[in-house]
Amino acid sequence: MARLDHNPGRETAGMLTGPLCLDRRGFVLASLASLAASPAMGARGPIRVLIVDGVSNHDWRLTTRLLLKILESTGLFAVSISTSPPKADAPGWDQWRPDFESCDVVLQTYNDIWGGPAWPERVKSAFETFVARGGGVFFLHSANNAFADWPAYNEMIGLGWREKDFGRAIYIDDDERQAVIPAGVGEGTDHGPRYDALVRRIGEHPVHEGLPRAWMTADVELYRYARGPACQLEVLSYAREPQTRMNWPMEWTVMYGRGRCYVANYGHVWDGDKDPVTLRSVDVQTILIRALQWLARREVTWPVPEDYPTAETVSIRPALP
């Protein structure tokens, strides 16, 4: 767990807690984290993954196809998809009810930024209940752009694509301590061109057990100044961003009630991308599978492959068939 040190703008590496970490009812979220050791849902058989898609400023159709191929190739997952209507005035919203309770983990790629439709209130409520009771959620790349006006969602992602006054940002200092940038200081969330980044992991999280301390990831779009409540948040890895020359989180986890949330910067698939490198990267595929195991409260058993990237070289697999 993190502790505040003598500099109020810094916190030690670990989970961010403290007086600012209150939910909208005024209760400290840390009190809920103690409930996290609840029994696993669907502890036997394949891990049930529900991909939620249908709207995004990214290519969600290609993203879903590639995710399906990666997950189905492992034999570990039973994957279903819930696709929303495409626009706010499209038919079908009254009937759209993702069956969160039938899955172990939601793989969330939906993104309403740029005026896309928000989820109906009944879907939001069902999602909140699913996570608070112990469900897992994997927020892939632009999923943390979504739902800026939804308080519970902001708590789940911890940090998202937000204006600079929205909340605090987190960076990693040169001693690998999590440091806080207050709301209104610095910039709103942004990114530079995609690049091959040196990722450094922090600590010994189960998702990263057995991985090298550092490796190259290919063609990543790293967010700088991601902002939010950042409560019950633990940064798992980071990379140096060329423009700011600062270390920004690459992956992080958040506890929401009994639920586990995992947020990833990688996975950018833009309209017009063909065989996007990021989802062919060995590190991204490996961590995706291992994170889903952890989110489902299973033992993380997926092995570290021999072709895992090194600190000097990316590792890219052939285009998925």
Question: How should each PLM-predicted stretch be described?
Answer:
Residues 11-34:
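N-terminal secretory signal peptides and thylakoid transit peptides that target proteins
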Residues 40-42:
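Boundary at the C-terminal end of the N-terminal hydrophobic targeting segment
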Residues 45-47, 62, 73, 242-250, ...:
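Extracellular ligand-binding/catalytic regions of CAZymes and related secreted enzymes
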Residues 54-57, 141, 194-195, 269-282:
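Active-site rim elements
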Residues 56-57, 112-113, 144-146, 213, ...:
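Short, solvent-exposed loop/turn segments at secondary-structure junctions
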